[in-house]
């Protein structure tokens, strides 16, 4: 099986880290989550198909925006966003615990 390769623009990576607090090097780990969710970004896929990966990283659900370029995954955005967490939990049927009444 071929090993997945990741790439990104270093300037864009630094901008993302400054703005959202997530390095693209960390974002790669969302793809390792066996329960990750991959979805096509239908609202921004005009010239090339863009995708989201929602995966658990460091006890939070990380949303990674990326494109496939041959056998390479090119990351162009990442952050811990509520909507990504909601999608991840819905697709994995994760339910919040409600405290029991005594």
Residue ranges and their predicted role:
Residues 1-102:
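Ribonuclease/tRNase effector modules and their secretory precursors
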